[in-house]
Amino acid sequence: MAPLLPIRTLPLILILLALLSPGAADFNISSLSGLLSPALTESLLVALPPCHLTGGNATLMVRRANDSKVVTSSFVVPPCRGRRELVSVVDSGAGFTVTRLSAYQVTNLVPGTKFYISYLVKKGTATESSREIPMSTLPRRNMESIGLGMARTGGMVVITVLLSVAMFLLVLGFIIALALGSRK
């Protein structure tokens, strides 16, 4: 009887099994492209690891571009409730919408800097890692360059003065009413 697999293909099959094993599987993360801006001045919003890693110990690694120092942050991957979307509508009505953001916020970053972000998640004996994605924080803007628009217009000053005078007259009338009421 002939062997089922030739001896030469066995090493190739073992290599393929090692590469495709669950412990070596990579997953993708994103920079929350569904948001108006996932980048803030001193922080970034990063999508959470996939749902099949719920309960695993995640380590978020942040590396500054052109630097070898890696800053890590650890947390437990939160459970998924249905399909995990980056921004999901929780309640909507009466002219407002309540949303829930499923993301991890990386804080204390340098403004206007490019970073490379990746996850390493350990769940049981399996370890999965994400591919490294580039993200940049927003540059800090000069305070004088921010337009205030209607900061102190003439109409606002007039309304404030009128309200102040009306409040003074109201308090004065209340005091006079108390004084005249106690004479009887």
UniProtKB/Swiss-Prot annotation:
Where in or outside the cell?
A: Cell membrane
InterPro entries recorded: Uroplakin-2 (IPR009952)
Per the UniProt entry, the glycosylated residues are: 28, 57, 66
Signal sequence annotation? 1-25
Membrane topology term:
Single-pass type I membrane protein
User: One GO biological process from the UniProt record?
Assistant: epithelial cell differentiation
Pfam families in UniProt: Uroplakin_II
Expression by tissue, per the entry, reads: Expressed in ureter.
**Principal location listed in the UniProt entry:** membrane
Q: Which UniProt keywords apply?
A: Cell membrane, Cleavage on pair of basic residues, Glycoprotein, Membrane, Signal, Transmembrane, Transmembrane helix
| Record topological domains on the Lumenal side | 85-155
Propeptide part(s) removed at maturation, as residue ranges: 26-84
Question: Which regions span the lipid bilayer?
Answer: 156-176
Could you tell me which residue ranges are on the Cytoplasmic side of the membrane? 177-184
* Any one GO CC term of the record: plasma membrane
Q: What does this protein do?
A: Component of the asymmetric unit membrane (AUM); a highly specialized biomembrane elaborated by terminally differentiated urothelial cells. May play an important role in regulating the assembly of the AUM.
State whether it acts alone or in a complex, and with which partners, per the record: Interacts with uroplakin-1a (UPK1A).
Q: Which family does it belong to?
A: Belongs to the uroplakin-2 family.
Protein name, please? Uroplakin-2
Q: From which organism does this entry originate?
A: Homo sapiens
Quick one: which gene encodes this?
A: UPK2
